[in-house]
C-alpha cells in the first residue's frame, strides 16, 4: 500500500503498514468502551460473542472491534507551493459578492474560524473561490464538505472546472478509490476517516440534516481539521448554536444579505387556520389555502405546497381533487419518479407540486410561489422555513412572490424564521436592496 | 426512552392499564412498529417443498428439478427488506441485529417437530472476520448440536457471490464432527440456515447427516 493513503487519515488495516502509528480502534475508559474513529460510546449490548465490543455508530464505514487497529501517518502537506493561482474560473462576482469574498479571504489568511452567512441564492460557492485559490496556492490541504451528498456531487465538477488542482471526491459508494490530493470534496461522514489532516475545512450547508443534529459528525469536522487549521461554514440559516458563537465573537462572520439580483427576500406571511390536521383527516383543506390555490390556478401561477410528512401527501392531493383543483403532482424522498417529477415542474408541464421538505434547499424553480401547510409542525425548523421561503424569487426576472405559511398558531420556530428574514432584509436595505 | 435497534428511531413503550396494574418495569420492544411492519412473513400459496412464495400450491420448478422429497420451511420471502437486513447483520457484521429475528425463529422452532437442531456452521476464516455465526446468533436458549464442520479450502469464495450454476456445481464442503456418531443415530434432525436460494448447501449438509445415521432431515430457513 502506498503510504500517502495514510497521510492524515485513520484507517483500520489488517496488517500493520511499514510506517505509521497504530492505536486500538476501541479504548476502554472507566469500564466503558469508546470508539477511536467516531468518539462515541459503545452501547452496553453491542458485543460480539466472547465479549468483543464493536462500534455500531460508524458501522457503515466498516466494523471496528476491540481487535481492530487504526493506523495514521501525520499529515506532511506534500504539495508543491504553486507559483501562480490555480483559479481558472472566468466568471465575474457582483460588487456585493466581491466585498464578501475579500472579507472571507482576509479572515482565511488570518487563520480565523468563520461563517459566511449569505441569503439563499446569493452564490456562496463562488464567494469562497478567491480564498480557496489562495489556500491551494500556499500548499494547504483543503476539504470542501457537506452533509448532503447531492451538494458534493453537484460541487465536484464545478470545482474541477474552476481549479487546476487534483481533487478527490469521497462519498458513500464512490466509484473511484481515495487518492491523496490537495483538494478533497466529501460528505461529512467521510471526515470520520481523517485525523488532523486539513489546514482549512469548508462546510457547505452547515445547518443541514444530519450534521445539525449529530454530535458524531460535528466532532468529525473538528477532528479532521489540524490543530493549527481553521474552518469556514457556509449557510443561509445558521442555527441557534452558531448564532450564539457569533454573539460571543468566537466565530468571525461575513454577511451577504442581498441576492445576486439585488432584491430583498420575500417576507414570510402567516395565516392562521383552525386545526388543519383534523381537517386533513376528513380530506379537507383550510378554506383560505384552497382559495389561494384556486387563485394561482386562474392566473397560471405555479406553486409549491410543502406538507410536513410523506403520509400527508396523498391526503392533500385527494383534498385538492375533491375541491376541483387538478394538475398537481406529489413528490417525496423515496419516490422512484422524483427526478422526473421535479423536472416536469421545472419545465412548466405541471402547475403545482406537493412536496415534503426534500425540496427545501438546493433547487431553483423560476417564478414560483410557496405555500406551507402546517408550518407549526416540528418538521419545519426555523432553518427549514427560511430555506423554503428562499425558493421564491431567485431569478432576476421574477424577484418576488408569495410565501404563505398556514399554521394553527404562531410558534416560536415561525417567529424566529420571520425574525431571521427581517434581520437579513434590514441589513440588505442598508446596502441598497429593493423590495421585489 | 430507547431506540429501535434497526432504524435507530425512538421507541416509546405502550402503557396500558394492565401494565400499570402489574407494576412491572415497562418493556420496550427492541424493534419499532414501523420496522416490524416492514417484515412481512411468507403467506400461502407456497411451494409445498421449499416454501417458495408463488401463485399455485404445486411443487415449484426448482424442486421438480431436484427430484427429491426435501422439505424446507421458511419464515420470510427473500425480498428487499430481508436483503437489507442480511446486508447489515451478516455482511457489515452488526451482531446486535440478531434480536430482530430471535422472536420469529423462536416461534418457528416451536412449530417444528425435531429431535436435534443443527445450525449450518461457518468457516474458521469467517469466524475471524465476522466474529460470529449468523445462524446461532438467532437462537436464544434452544439447545443445538454443532455436528457439522466446514473448512476454508472448500469455500474459496462466499456462496452469495456465485451464480446459480456455480452454486449447484459446488462440492461437498461439510464434514461430520467427531461427536456426531453419538448424537445422530435414529434422530430427526432439523437444519437451520439463513437463506434457501438453490438448496445446494442444505442438501450437502443433509447428505453428511444421513451418513451419521439420522433417520430424517428437514430444514428451516429464515428466508426463501
Feature roles, as predicted:
Chain A
Residues 196-272:
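Post-DEXD/H (motif II) to motif III coupling segment of the RecA-like Helicase ATP-binding lobe
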Residues 117-125, 135, 140-155, 282-286, ...:
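Conserved strand-helix element at the start of the C-terminal RecA-like helicase core
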Residues 89-112:
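N-terminal pre-P-loop "Q-motif" helix
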Residues 205-208, 342, 346-351, 355-399, ...:
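Conserved RecA-like helicase motor core of SF1/SF2 enzymes
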Residues 226-241, 389-420:
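Conserved segment of the helicase C-terminal RecA-like domain
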Residues 27-80:
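Interdomain "pre-motor" coupling segment immediately N-terminal to P-loop NTPase/helicase cores
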Amino acid at each position: 500500500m502506498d503510504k500517502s493513503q495514510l497521510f492524515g487519515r485513520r484507517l483500520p488495516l489488517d496488517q500493520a503498514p511499514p510506517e505509521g502509528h497504530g492505536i486500538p480502534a476501541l479504548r476502554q475508559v472507566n469500564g466503558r468502551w469508546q470508539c477511536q474513529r467516531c468518539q462515541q460510546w459503545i452501547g452496553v449490548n453491542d458485543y460480539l460473542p466472547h465479549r468483543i465490543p464493536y462500534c455500531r455508530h460508524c458501522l457503515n464505514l466498516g466494523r471496528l472491534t476491540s481487535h481492530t487497529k487504526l493506523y495514521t501517518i501525520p499529515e506532511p502537506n506534500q504539495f508543491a507551493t504553486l507559483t501562480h493561482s490555480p483559479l481558472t474560473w472566468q466568471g465575474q462576482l457582483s460588487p456585493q459578492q466581491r466585498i464578501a469574498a475579500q472579507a472571507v479571504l482576509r479572515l482565511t489568511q488570518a487563520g480565523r474560524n468563520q461563517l459566511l452567512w449569505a441569503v439563499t441564492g446569493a452564490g456562496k460557492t463562488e464567494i469562497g473561490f478567491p480564498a480557496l485559490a489562495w489556500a491551494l496556492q500556499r500548499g494547504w490541504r483543503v476539504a470542501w464538505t457537506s452533509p448532503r451528498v447531492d451538494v458534493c456531487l453537484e460541487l465536484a465538477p464545478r470545482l474541477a472546472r474552476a481549479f487546476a488542482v487534483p481533487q478527490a471526491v469521497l462519498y458513500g459508494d464512490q466509484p473511484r478509490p481515495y487518492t491523496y490530493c490537495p483538494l478533497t470534496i466529501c460528505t461529512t461522514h467521510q471526515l470520520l476517516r481523517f485525523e488532523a489532516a486539513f489546514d482549512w475545512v469548508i462546510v457547505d450547508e452547515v445547518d443541514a440534516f444530519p450534521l445539525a443534529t449529530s454530535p458524531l459528525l460535528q466532532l468529525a469536522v473538528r477532528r479532521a481539521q489540524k490543530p493549527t487549521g481553521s474552518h469556514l461554514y457556509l449557510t443561509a440559516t445558521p442555527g441557534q448554536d452558531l448564532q450564539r458563537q457569533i454573539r460571543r465573537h468566537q466565530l468571525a462572520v461575513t454577511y451577504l444579505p442581498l441576492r445576486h439580483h439585488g432584491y430583498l427576500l420575500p417576507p414570510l406571511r402567516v395565516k392562521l387556520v383552525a386545526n388543519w390536521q383534523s381537517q386533513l383527516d376528513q380530506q379537507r383543506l383550510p378554506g383560505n389555502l384552497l382559495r389561494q390555490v384556486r387563485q394561482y390556478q386562474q392566473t397560471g401561477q405555479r406553486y409549491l405546497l410543502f406538507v410536513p410528512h410523506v403520509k400527508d401527501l396523498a391526503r392533500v392531493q385527494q383534498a385538492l381533487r375533491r375541491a376541483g383543483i387538478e394538475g398537481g403532482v406529489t413528490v417525496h424522498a423515496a419516490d422512484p419518479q422524483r427526478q422526473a417529477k421535479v423536472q416536469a415542474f421545472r419545465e412548466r408541464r405541471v402547475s403545482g407540486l406537493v412536496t415534503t421538505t426534500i425540496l427545501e434547499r438546493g433547487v431553483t424553480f423560476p417564478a414560483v410561489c410557496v405555500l406551507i401547510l402546517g408550518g407549526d409542525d416540528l418538521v419545519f425548523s426555523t432553518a427549514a422555513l427560511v430555506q423554503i421561503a428562499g425558493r421564491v424569487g431567485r431569478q432576476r426576472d421574477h424577484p418576488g412572490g408569495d410565501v404563505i405559511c398556514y399554521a394553527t398558531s404562531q410558534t416560536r420556530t415561525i417567529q424566529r424564521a420571520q425574525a431571521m428574514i427581517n434581520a437579513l432584509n434590514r441589513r440588505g436595505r442598508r446596502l441598497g436592496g429593493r423590495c421585489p | 426512552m430507547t431506540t429501535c435497534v434497526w432504524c435507530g428511531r425512538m421507541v416509546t413503550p405502550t402503557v396500558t392499564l394492565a401494565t400499570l396494574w402489574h407494576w412491572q418495569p415497562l418493556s420496550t420492544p427492541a424493534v419499532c412498529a414501523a420496522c416490524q411492519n416492514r417484515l412481512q412473513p411468507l403467506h400461502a400459496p407456497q411451494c409445498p417443498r421449499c416454501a417458495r412464495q408463488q401463485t399455485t400450491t404445486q411443487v415449484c420448478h426448482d424442486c421438480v428439478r431436484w427430484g427429491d422429497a426435501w422439505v424446507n420451511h421458511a419464515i420470510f420471502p427473500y425480498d428487499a427488506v430481508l436483503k437489507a437486513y442480511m446486508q447489515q447483520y451478516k455482511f457489515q457484521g452488526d451482531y446486535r441485529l440478531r434480536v430482530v429475528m430471535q422472536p420469529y425463529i423462536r416461534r418457528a422452532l416451536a412449530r417444528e417437530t425435531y429431535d436435534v437442531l443443527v445450525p449450518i456452521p461457518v468457516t474458521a476464516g469467517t469466524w475471524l472476520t465476522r466474529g460470529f455465526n449468523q445462524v446461532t446468533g438467532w437462537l436464544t436458549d434452544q439447545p443445538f448440536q454443532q455436528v457439522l464442520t466446514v473448512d476454508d479450502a472448500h469455500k474459496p469464495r462466499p456462496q452469495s457471490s456465485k451464480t446459480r450454476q456455480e452454486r449447484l456445481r459446488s462440492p461437498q464442503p461439510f464434514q461430520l464432527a467427531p461427536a456426531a456418531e453419538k448424537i445422530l443415530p435414529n434422530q430427526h434432525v432439523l437444519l437451520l440456515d439463513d437463506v434457501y436460494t438453490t438448496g445446494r448447501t442444505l442438501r450437502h449438509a443433509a447428505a453428511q447427516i444421513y451418513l451419521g445415521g439420522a433417520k430424517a432431515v428437514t430444514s428451516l430457513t429464515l428466508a426463501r
